[in-house]
Amino acid sequence: MANINMADTVPSCDTYLLFNGETLLPIGVRAFIYTAVLAYCFIGLSAITGRFFKSMESIMRHSREVVTVDPHTNATIVKHEKVWNYTIADVALLAFGTSFPQISLATIDAIRNLGQLTAGGLGPGTLVGSAAFDLFPIHAVCVVMPRAGSKKKISDLGVWLVELFWSFWAYIWLYIILEVWTPRVITLWEALLTVLQYGLLLLHAYAQDKRWPYVSIPLARGERPEDWVPAEDASVDYDDNYDGIGDILPGQNEDIVDIFSAHSYSNEGYHHVSEEDVEESSTGLTLKNKWEDTHWFSIWWQQFVDAATLESSVSRKMDSTCLRVIGISWNLIIAPWKMLFAFVPPYEIAHGWIAFICSLIFISGIAYGVTKITDQISCVTGVSPYVIAFTALAAGTSWPDLVASKIAAERQITADSAITNITCSNSVNIYVGIGVPWLVDTMYNYFVYQKPLYIDNAAGLSFSLLVFFATSFGCITVLVLRRVILGAELGGPRMWAWATSVYFMILWVVFVVLSSLKISGVI
């Protein structure tokens, strides 16, 4: 109670929302309002992340034309090659992209903390908590997603083992620099080494994918889709229009991408082109570009129309009035977010890069708002920001990961998209999500104060790392046993799938409870 009373005297608790008399409200009411606003921010974060994923998919599917001449026939041969390597796309763009809400939040927290010798607690707490949420609840959801009796396993076990090794090493490394080398202090070179290890992860994963001798694990690769976006499970009945603009041309999302991308992925391979076709193609290409521009603007305009529509064509066909009312109410709640994110250009333009960058800007803006609201919740309730970070913030920022992995586990023919992304994201959380903010703070302190960066709550963070390491070992052990005994990481007999899911959730509860008790000084 003493902490709650003290919260009223802290200047940062005076006001934040845009109405008068906020400070006159009871503490409980203010905490409820801030929590509701925080939840609304998470809804917006989930919405923009959906567009973010689609833009990444467009980027990673981009192919380029390589024109060669057949030495025997002198015919022009056009070859379409993927720009992105399958594994590098997973580690570089997908893992980084799915972790960007957490990375953005941690970086903003570090920038706000410039000028102080002590690091903020929101960033590291959120990233460690997010790693736990990714590993336990997301695995718990994915393992029960395949249909009863069906099994889905990782196709390239070697790459997964490499990524798993770097994921475990990331948390061992973090514990070493926090408790062994320079206890409770982060130096400039430690922060720099943390960031550089992300490059080593990329190199090692690529070496494993290419089966380089001496540095790769000699494991055979299973059947893997040719595209970065894996083939979809034909046994699953679903709506292709789950993305934000699915109602533009129902059931034709793939056709939209093929038409409006400068390089169609459906025509990969080789084909001969006569000289006459090459000469005559310039006029046709000009007309095609004009036609594409018109349709791009048409699609962009349709995004605003969809954002302003409270009842979709699907909900109109529902027989239940109650469900229709619920759907309209929900669309009314998220309408401001939908209208705001309609300004993000369609992901078909420039292979998705413009939508990718715009989505990053929106995610960063929401992350900044989340940090401010979290400060207010901590201030008015007296709850440690670190506790809020690895519980509410971690779950909220990882929610898009859960949705994406759930869809992948349900729709894809392999478990790579669902499981491998989790281990990659956890590595990125440390090497980039914690490394970059610490690098920013340590560089500032080194050049301005000639001082290192002090970690105020190093003991609590180190304890959380130990608990996470122990529980994650239990999680990975069960996944390996499922691979050996059942033949796949996901699916299988429903009883064992649900038993595994419950076990993973218990591990997450153990992590949250023990970490909270340590931060609160109970243990």
Swiss-Prot record:
Its membrane topology: Multi-pass membrane protein
Gene3D superfamilies documented for this protein: NCX, central ion-binding region (1.20.1420.30)
Domain of life: Eukaryota
Keywords: Ion transport, Membrane, Transmembrane, Transmembrane helix, Transport, Vacuole
InterPro entries the UniProt entry points to: CaCA (IPR051171), NaCa_Exmemb (IPR004837), NCX_ion-bd_dom_sf (IPR044880)
GO CC annotation, single: membrane
Residues in coiled coil: none
GO biological process: metal ion transport; transmembrane transport
Record localization: Vacuole membrane
Transmembrane segments: 24-44, 88-108, 125-145, 157-177, 185-205, 325-345, 349-369, 377-397, 428-448, 461-481, 495-515
PANTHER family, A to Z: NA_CA-EXCHANGE PROTEIN, ISOFORM G (PTHR11878:SF65), SODIUM/CALCIUM EXCHANGER (PTHR11878)
Functional note: Vacuolar transporter that exchanges protons with Mg(2+), Zn(2+) and Fe(2+) ions. May control the partitioning of Mg(2+) and Zn(2+) between plant organs.
UniProt record similarity statement: Belongs to the Ca(2+):cation antiporter (CaCA) (TC 2.A.19) family. MHX subfamily.
Name of the molecule in the record: Magnesium/proton exchanger 1
Organism of provenance: Oryza sativa subsp. japonica (Rice)
